Structure formats: C-alpha cells, structure tokens
Amino acid sequence: MKRDSDMKKTGSTSDFLPTRNRELLQTLRRLIMTTEGVPLGGLYAMAAQSPCSRFWVSEKRAAEVISRMMRGEDTDVKSLPLRNKMYRELLRRVQEWQAQNPGRPLTDAVFAAVNSPAPEFYVTPESAKVIISRIMQRKRR
C-alpha cells in the first residue's frame, strides 16, 4: 500500500495526462516532418522543450504551490528541477498579472497563468520518450 507521501497530489499533472500526452506526440510528429538530420533522441529533447498550449498542472495545485512560494515557505517541488522551473515561471506570470490587475484574487491570476501558453512541456527528454513509446504501444494493440 502506498503511503500518503508517495501518492501524487490531487490536481497534479496526472489529471491532464491524456491531453498533455497527445499534444507531446503531435509535437514530436511535427518535428519529425520538419526537422532533418536530427537523431530520434534529439527529437525527443526538442519535443520536451517545445512550447505547448498550457502549463500541465491544475489551477488548484498551482495555487497551493504559488501561495506557499509567495509566503516564502518551502515547497515540495524544490528537489524536482523541471517542476521547480515551471512553478517559478508560473509565479513570475502570476505576479505580473497581479501588477496589471490590482485587487483581483490570487485564484484569478493563477487561472490566467496556468491556462496561458507554456514555454515547454517541463518533462525530461527521457520522460518524453517513455510517454510517446507508451502511446505507440497502446495504438499497436
């Protein structure tokens, strides 16, 4: 049985896996069609670092982490470099949104930030390869 500390947080990326995974696969396919001379491993890295339609985390989870960051509290994402990078970018966008919309609730700022285009998928090239390989295996069955 999993301990609470081993389980994913409610509202984490896992709520969006099918949509994120489809978008990642589409990105890889586009790169395959438009990029010459790059080995497949390089294409996985390029796909992982490509812009995507949104940040793949729920507004609820993002609000929890960003709120703690704004209060200077320790977050549980510091040991995960890409997660940390993603939340730092979300925090930057939230603060920018709040400066332009004073008096509005944090939840509005987080909603706007999470649902804005993200600069990358925030997954490692190795994770991108595993994600896409699993999708392709399911399609073959």
Where do the model's predicted regions map?
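Short, charged amphipathic recognition helices of the HTH superfamily
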Residues: 32-51, 97-117
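Secondary-structure junction/capping motif
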Residues: 39, 58, 74-77, 81, ...
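Short, basic interhelical loop/turn and adjoining N-cap
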Residues: 48-65, 112-134
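Short, leucine/isoleucine-rich alpha-helical interaction segments at C-terminal helix-coil junctions
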Residues: 135-139
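Basic, amphipathic alpha-helix used for nucleic-acid engagement in HTH/winged-helix/SANT-Myb modules
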Residues: 1-33, 45, 50-99, 140-141
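A general marker of short, structured functional hotspots
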Residues: 12, 40, 83, 117-118
